[in-house]
From Swiss-Prot:
Organism lineage: Eukaryota, Viridiplantae, Streptophyta, Embryophyta, Tracheophyta
Organism whose genome encodes this protein: Zea mays (Maize)
Extent of the signal sequence: 1-21
Keywords for this protein: Repeat, Seed storage protein, Signal, Storage protein
Any GO MF annotation of the entry: nutrient reservoir activity
InterPro entries referenced in this protein's UniProt entry, alphabetically: Zein, Zein-alpha
Name of the featured protein: Zein-alpha PMS1
Family, as annotated: Belongs to the zein family.
Pfam families documented for this protein: Zein
């Protein structure tokens, strides 16, 4: 009897629960979290949500986070594209400054090269004249050091270029200019008197060759001026 009563109560309970139950299929879109009390936290609601809908919710959350950033990303890309010409111009300015610094560092060498440019052109046009000019370069430096003492020879070059060139050709062979510049300058100061006394260019060249060996001209110029010139030699 007691067993029958217990079975009857169980059947009544099952029927009552079946009448009040709500069935949700696995493919339903209605979340279980909507049936939960509102005082539960969002974390508990997300845990109680249908597992099939969780990837969809995650995708919606990612899309909701990306969409506000899309206009900002587009604006930044547009700003970068607009700044590309400025970056290119800045690179050109940096390159120009580097080249300017390089030119300033080598301005001394550049100036020296520009000074020697006429000599390079002379070497290309007339190599013989260029070699002769190179041989006379030490005497040109001596002329720059003593301009007043070499003034008569500059006048000679303006009046008679042929005699001046003959005189300059003999200068590299004069060891006196290398050994004793003072004696060489004394010898050159006596040269205008020979130009007045000797009309013959050949005799003048011989005098130039013998002049470094004439000690009288170096020791006593006054007596040397009074000494006569006989033929092509001077003793």
């Amino acid at each position: 009897m007691a067993a029958k009563i217990f079975c009857l109560l169980m059947l009544l309970g099952l029927s009552a629960s079946a009448a009040t139950a709500t069935i949700f299929p696995q493919c339903s879109q209605a979340p279980i979290a909507s049936l939960l009390p509102p005082y539960l936290s969002p974390a508990v609601s997300s845990v109680c949500e249908n597992p099939i809908l969780q990837p969809y919710r995650i995708q919606q959350a990612i899309a909701a986070g990306i969409l506000p950033l899309s206009p900002l990303f587009l604006q930044q890309s547009s700003a970068l594209l607009q700044q590309l010409p400025l970056v290119h111009l800045l690179a050109q300015n940096i390159r120009a400054q580097q080249l300017q610094q390089l030119v300033l560092a080598n301005v001394a060498a550049y100036s020296q090269q520009q000074q020697f440019l006429p000599f390079n052109q002379l070497a290309a046009l007339n190599s013989a004249a260029y070699l002769q000019q190179q041989q006379l370069l030490p005497f040109s430096q001596l002329t720059a050091a003593y301009p007043q003492q070499f003034l008569p020879f500059n006048q000679l070059a303006a009046l008679n270029s042929a005699a001046y060139l003959q005189q300059q050709q003999l200068l590299p062979f004069s060891q006196l200019a290398v050994v004793s510049p003072a004696a060489f300058l004394t010898q050159q100061q006596l040269l205008p008197f020979y130009l007045h006394a000797v009309p013959n260019a050949g005799t003048l060249l011989q005098l130039q060759q013998l002049l470094p060996f004439n000690q009288l001209a170096l020791t006593n110029p006054a007596a040397f001026y009074q000494q006569p010139i006989i033929g092509g030699a001077l003793f």
